[in-house]
UniProtKB/Swiss-Prot annotation:
Transcription regulation listed as a keyword: no
Protein name: Acetyl-CoA decarbonylase/synthase complex subunit delta 1
Assembly with partners or alone: Heterodimer of delta and gamma chains. The ACDS complex is made up of alpha, epsilon, beta, gamma and delta chains with a probable stoichiometry of (alpha(2)epsilon(2))(4)-beta(8)-(gamma(1)delta(1))(8) (Potential).
Function, in words: Part of a complex that catalyzes the reversible cleavage of acetyl-CoA, allowing growth on acetate as sole source of carbon and energy. Probably maintains the overall quaternary structure of the ACDS complex.
Species whose genome carries this gene: Methanosarcina thermophila
Amino acid sequence: MAKKMKLSDITNMFVGMDVEALEGVTIEGDIEIDLGGLGGGFDPMLAAALGQESAVLAQHFARLAGMFGYPVGFGGAAAPAISPALAAPKLKDLIPAKFDVANIAEWTTEIQEVPIGNTSADGGSRGKRVLVGGEKALPFYFDAPMPNRNQVTIDVFDMRIGLAKAVKENYDEVMDSPGEWAKKNVEKFNADMITIHLISTDPLIKDTPAKEAAKTVEEVLQAVDVPIAIGGSGNPQKDPEVLAKAAEVAEGERCLLASASLNLDYAAIAEAALKYDHDVLSWTQLDMNAQKELNRKLMKQCNVPRDRIIMDPTTAALGYGLDYAYTNMERIRLAALMGDDELTFPMSSGTTNAWGARESWMVGSPLSQDTDWGPREYRGPIWEIVTGLSLAIAGNDLFMMMHPTSVAVLKQITQTLFGSIEAEPVDITNWIGAEV
């Protein structure tokens, strides 16, 4: 008669033998389950006990199978049954919600609105008047819509100068004629304004007399009917004289004289602006306190009205301090909105400074280990666009720019955010394989 063994007897045989698995072993036999005692009917207590013993038996089988090297995914206690969740009722309508525009209590002061350019109704000859400023919140916020969109003025120079190739190819045939250059900027590149830079007046360049430089201003005024900004050469000794003479020949046109600063005779420039009906660009170098000081002197010492002052806090290009320029402009705008009346003026950016960054115009990196910079024909305009757009978000109102593509893209983005043009849907589903 075959010997009877319990499963526990088999597993106990290997206790203390450090056996992890049995290979090549076959166990033959019959399994006998004694259900004696069921008697005359179903006993729930007995059924529960039988179920428990069956579970123990299953655990023994699982342990035994594991010893033979067979993977087992069960053997733990049975999980309690989970009642099916009640189905949520199907929504017929979306939960109602209302968007309330925030009322920021700290923003109590409106930015001064400044007009540039006089039409015939104002005593000038411009075909339109440009308005900048007037904001009651940071740009493009729902809190208070911008009353005036961003404006772009494209640079013109009174002599042929060295320009990045990507820029020069757009102007090469007109660079010897400031009037034709200005006309091309307006008619072909959709400039809102023109900035004429009288750089030949610098004593270290051509030392052009102020009276002769003023003729260039007259030429530009006759060539286009948009408002203009008049810039000097940056020479602190010569600029006050040059700008005063330019202001005289442009009397009544309400030009923007660029610029008054703390390192030159700002009082002479302010005097010319008041005498000949012009605005003043108040220029400082990334210093909020210096900006306050210059604005205060223009208002208190020189009696320049608030609606004739535009600030230029200086634009540092992408990669060359853009974060400083952005932070400075944003701090100025926030302080103005919160009531600092020495800073409540629109701002202008020399976005053209982006072309001073070598990454905008060089063919490639001078470092052999650098990755490819990509074609400069795209890279340069993108450099100018990113510089301008960053400062637009910080609160800048007026942009002095050069490349026509940069001008077009910046105007499209800012005017879309402003709400004056509708954005066109763009298919971005193929962005991985898209070619530029």
